[in-house]
Amino acid sequence: LTANSLEQITTTLRSGGIVVIRTDTIYGIIALATDEMAVEKVYAVKQRDLSKQCIVLIANASSVPAHAELIRHYSETEKIPTSVVVPASNEPEWIVRGGDSVAYRIVRNELLKQVIEQVGPVIAPSANPESKTPARNIAEAKKYFGDSVDLYVDGGEVPRTVHASQIIRVKPDGTIDHLR
């Protein structure tokens, strides 16, 4: 994608819009994690259970200083994209959703990393209504969401062998719970 596309994505997000874009794994619907109205728009468009949290994508571990080492370690050592669940610290209610933890993932996708470096962390649930399978291409995403999404960014077809990220929680004793 061109610099113009990057600018279009960041402008859309900064103005409260939501964007369907390929992540490290599958297509996601992204919105600024700091924008409550945009986050709620994603929930409405996906018809997502309001009590379910979304993974927060970050460009680097310094975005979460209290847990930077843990997030960095698992992002670098796991072979597949891995979201790490850590205790919530000062995240807003529209992110924690009544819970006491948050899942963060350092993105590997270069375009998405550039976007996040410019606008800050984004939520990124899969690009599908709650009861449907994730979109594997932009045409499927458009069928699901139509004009309710502000911008679609075509990242090609997602191979059937690619699935959503692994989600882990590191327990106080150092053992790992594989949540997905």
Give the location of each predicted region.
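Active-site-adjacent structural elements in enzyme catalytic cores
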Residues: L1-R180
